[in-house]
Each structure stands twice: as C-alpha cells, then as structure tokens.
C-alpha cells in the first residue's frame, strides 16, 4: 500500500484521528484500486457515473467534494448534537465519506480500448455492496462498512446510523449538483 500516494490523493485521510481506522480505510481504498486495475496514473479517469451523458465529474473529485462538505457541515452542526446530548462521531463521518464510493472502483474498470466500462459484476454487486465487502476484507470497522452499504438507494428501507444518514444526504446533494442539467442515458 502506498500511504503517501493515498494521503496526497485524499488529504482528508489525515482528518481521521484514530490511526487504526485511518490505516484500515487506506488499505481498503488501495485494495479496491488494485482489484480493478486502477493505478496512480489512471485513478483520475474513474468517473463518478456512466449513467449520465457528458458527465465530466471524476470519482476523485466527487469523493473529495463529499468528504470536504461532510467535514465542514459536521464542524458547523455538531453544536446541535452536543446540545441535545447526541453522540456524533467525526472520524466515522470522515471515514465513511472517503470510502462511501470505493465500490465504484470495481463497478467501473479501465476499458481494454481505453476509457472506462462497467466491470463484469456491476449488475450483481452495485458499488454499495462491493464497497462494503472490500472495506470489510480490509478490516474496516463495521459502522463504516454499514455506512458504505446503505449510502445509496439500497439503503432506502434499511436502518441508518446518524452518521450514515449524514453522509448519504451530503452525497446525494453533491451528486445531484454534479449531474444537474445533464441527460440520463
């Protein structure tokens, strides 16, 4: 695992104070990259979606935006949770924001003729499930694995922790901004 590369790609890994959690999250991301052929050279080619025509938002940009917004919103809103005596875990929010879409590294793969194509199992294991599996294999805590698994429509009728609800809401907002005005395929 190239920790320096990952922390350069996503400096917000350094926002995770729990060293064991940070290390397991970085390992999960590295494993996801290696599993599907994404490298230092082509990681910026991973799209956030293949389902919208002309979407020019990369996976790296999307994950960065979701994570930064989660950190900013958490730091602003934690006063309400504290005021009401509600536990709200910043490390869990940051880790979940960074990893919520790691399954996209298997859902989308580099095409043999260039570009990006759907991976061989994308219909069987959409990114929330494949991401949760990868994170679990890397030893990521179950509360982060839960967040990954329920962050998309697969989680519509599932139990949500406060942190998973929070990241999911920010993710939906950022994604909608990314595709606003584009035509769905």
What are these regions (language model features)?
Residues 1-117:
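Acidic/His-rich, divalent-metal-binding segments that scaffold phosphate/diphosphate chemistry
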Residues 62, 100, 127, 151-152:
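Histidine-centered active-site/metal-ligand motif
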Residues 84-88, 93-94, 132-136, 140-185:
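Histidine/acidic-rich helix-loop-helix segments that form or flank divalent-metal centers
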Residues 31-32, 60, 129-134, 139-140:
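Generic detector of short, locally flexible boundary/turn motifs and exposed helical patches
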Residues 114-137, 165:
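Divalent-cation-assisted or electrostatically stabilized phosphate/pyrophosphate-binding catalytic cores
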Residues 58, 90-91, 123, 127, ...:
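Short, well-structured alpha-helical patches and their helix-loop capping segments
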